[in-house]
Design a protein with these regions (language model features):
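Aromatic-anchored glycine-rich loop motif in surface-exposed flexible loops
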Residues: 1-29, 178-198, 207, 212-214, ...
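Short, surface-exposed recognition loops and adjoining beta-strand edges that mediate ligand/DNA contacts
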Residues: 2-105, 233-250, 267
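Extracytoplasmic/secreted proteins, especially bacterial periplasmic and envelope-associated proteins
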Residues: 32, 36-39, 43, 135, ...
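Structured segments of extracytoplasmic/periplasmic soluble domains
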Residues: 40-51, 207-213, 223-234, 250, ...
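Elongated scaffold/linker segments in the mid-to-C-terminal portions of large proteins
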Residues: 50-215, 272-439
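Generic secondary-structure boundary/loop-capping signal
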Residues: 81-82, 141, 195, 233, ...
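Active-site-adjacent helix/loop patches that line small-molecule binding or acyl-intermediate pockets
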Residues: 252-262, 266-276
Length: 439
């Protein structure tokens, strides 16, 4: 709306919004910035890397998941070798609240409970949990979890009711307050997890994006496969032979798999030019999913996974945290990286002795009136709302998935303060709105 401000800079425009007087566009000389980024990203991984490195091994006897090992460092108040920049938090101060209170694994607890309250403000869209990840990808269970905590020493299945804590559906699992060692016994918001900003895997995948943008396809593929080999524990799931848009799409997806819940995906989508397209795709998929749940009792994804309307759950004796799933037929171990800490051993008040949640039917359809369902109920399992609640609340979900996008031509608008330099040089033509400062 003020073209004279841009001087000789030219833009490639995807779409425009006359009402908001804005455009979804990129500079025509964007590859110059890719070249600059390539130099800095390569240095961050080599000459300027210092002691930082991708965590590719796991020395723990009870787990073999280098991806999770990175996050465990942070929960133990240590600096991971993979961390490049984090905002430091101090234990037992309110400034430490973000990943131990706002964004971690959901809990109904309060202060000094088992465990404390966690709002779980980051949720995974169910279609991505069920239909996005390869079932062999070790990142899925570390990144997202289907059970939360009641604050009284017990694990319990999340609901898809609109809400927080144990409502709201599948949530971020990279930071689980139960896994802190030593466990923080104190008031909520005080566990002291640092706030992550950038890590080595992020840099590797940004460099892959840059390489693909500069047509260095072989190098881009090699970078992506570094991340995939860690995620799967082998090279059998490596990508190969991709170029052009197919390669760029693969890199975009890899960043989603790797960086879920770390604050990158929306900006990745904006930068890719696919924000509005992806928003409409996921909403359409969720609409179809909800309809199938209502009419068929389940929804089947292209990878063969099934999201059912109901699951069967049972509280079982003991209190243990689980790790990589070694037996998918064990209803306590599958999916992995859930369970509950034995809070009674810490002297905290707990309810009962059956603290772990066994789940049957999470990835398959069990007809409620079937012989299988009857057998499970005879064993003490309880028919539990799962996808049925999601279907009943689908309008709430659809209105909150990338809101404001109404078509693939919509312009995604993010409001950032206009820098003082721009305001001062605009001769009064540019000002910050929304109550933002002018200087």
């Amino acid at each position: 709306d003020m073209p004279e401000l841009y001087g000789s800079v030219q833009f490639e425009t995807l779409s425009t919004d006359a009402k908001r007087k804005c455009a979804y566009a990129r500079r025509s000389d964007y590859k110059n910035y890719y070249t600059i980024a390539e130099d800095y990203l390569q240095k961050a991984l080599s000459t300027n890397a210092g002691t930082t490195k991708l965590v590719t091994t796991d020395e723990r006897s009870y787990a073999n998941n280098p991806f999770q090992r990175h996050f465990q460092y942070g929960m133990d108040l240590l600096m991971s070798p993979e961390a490049i920049f984090e905002i430091g938090c101090v234990q037992n101060q309110a400034t430490s609240r973000m990943y131990c209170y706002d964004f971690g694994r959901g809990s109904n607890g309060g202060n000094n409970t088992a465990p404390n309250k966690v709002f779980a403000g980051i949720r995974m869209v169910p279609s991505f949990y069920y239909g996005g990840y390869d079932n062999a990808d070790k990142r899925r269970d570390v990144s997202a979890v289907v059970t939360g905590l009641d604050g009284k020493g017990n694990e319990l299945a999340f609901t898809f009711k609109a809400g927080a804590k144990v409502d709201g559906g599948i949530c971020l699992n990279k930071w689980d307050i139960c896994r802190q060692n030593p466990y923080f016994v104190g008031p909520q918001m005080g566990a002291g997890f640092n706030i992550p900003i950038m890590r080595v895997a992020d840099v590797i995948l940004m460099l892959a994006e840059v390489k693909a943008g500069l047509d260095a396809d072989t190098e881009a593929i090699g970078l992506v496969n570094q991340i995939r080999e860690r995620a799967f524990g082998d090279d059998l799931h490596n990508i190969s032979g991709l170029s052009g848009e197919a390669l760029k799409e693969a890199i975009l997806m890899e960043r989603k798999f790797e960086l879920f819940g770390e604050g990158h995906t929306s900006y990745d989508l904006v930068r890719s030019g696919k924000f509005s397209q992806k928003a409409m795709e996921v909403r359409n998929e969720m609409s179809t999913l909800a309809e199938n749940l209502k009419t068929k009792g389940y929804h089947e994804f292209e990878n063969g996974n099934i999201l059912p309307a109901y699951i069967w759950t049972k509280q079982v004796a003991g209190a243990k945290l689980t790790y990589d799933c070694t037996d998918e037929n064990d209803p306590v171990l599958f999916p992995g990286w859930r369970g509950v800490l034995d809070f009674a051993q810490l002297g905290l008040s707990v309810n009962g002795t059956n603290h772990n949640t066994a789940i049957k039917g999470l990835f398959e359809y069990i007809a409620p009136d079937s012989e299988t369902a009857a057998e499970l109920e005879a064993e003490g399992y309880v028919k539990t709302e799962w996808g049925s609640t999601l279907a009943a609340n689908i309008d709430i979900y659809l209105s909150n998935i990338l809101p404001g996008i109404t078509s693939e031509e919509s312009v995604p608008c993010y409001y950032w303060p206009i820098p003082y330099e721009t305001i001062s040089q605009s001769k009064g033509k540019v000002t910050n709105g929304y109550g933002l400062p002018q200087q």
